[in-house]
Amino acid sequence: MKILIPTAKEMNTDLPSIEAIPLKPESQTVLDALALYSASQLESFYKVSAEKAAEEFQNIQALKRQTAQHYPALKLFDGLMYRNIKRDKLTEAEQDYLENHVFITSALYGVVPALSPMAPHRLDFLMKLKVVGKTLKSHWKAVYDEALKKEEVIFSLLSSEFETVFSKEIRAKMVTFKFMEDRGGQLKIHSTISKKARGAFLTALIENQVQTVGEARRLNFAGFVYREDLSQPQGLVFVKEV
């Protein structure tokens, strides 16, 4: 069983660095394409300020020169979902579960264990980077599928732009999750609720060593409970009353 989570734009580098590992050939090809952009070109590519683009340019060039600092990916990314994941003071069993079951899907690194070394960078599958004439999605599709072809159960906490990198055959094995709030009988869903809940849900998976869909249904976390009446066999819905 594998649990898939996306990358995040926000990063925290106020961490002890760890040793890098060599980039896979598929990652190196992506980096080579990204490294062709000047700082001013990155400004429009990323749709960010000149200051932010200059910072990203330095990050890319450091990776290219193999001088970039690397950090455990799960701790480097620091978006709302990540800030709601238990990342410190893990028991030995929780650490083992994290290492064996939780994987990050990256447009630069591929599908990698959550604690893999990563350098600060910005790239997702909505960005129109051409890699040897291919889109990012088509460049990665075979590698993404290969990473999961032996899995019977895949828990996806990904957004659609990450899920659609995988073939239909792999997506057919995915169990997806929706998190909603019940406000006086009205069910609401928005990105802040979803991101926080994904992090809390992953924490519950880790703490309870969940291996099956049945075990996931029984979880009660951060006020969320499973709603069978709203769920499908491979699309579980959790609701929090507020």
Curated annotation (Swiss-Prot):
Name by which UniProt lists this protein: UPF0246 protein SP70585_1589
Family annotation (Pfam families): H2O2_YaaD
InterPro entries: YaaA
Family statement drawn from the similarity comment of this UniProt entry: Belongs to the UPF0246 family.
Organism lineage string: Bacteria, Bacillati, Bacillota, Bacilli, Lactobacillales
Biological process, per Gene Ontology: response to hydroperoxide
Disulfide feature: none
NCBIfam families according to UniProt: PRK02101.1-4
GO cellular component, one term: cytosol
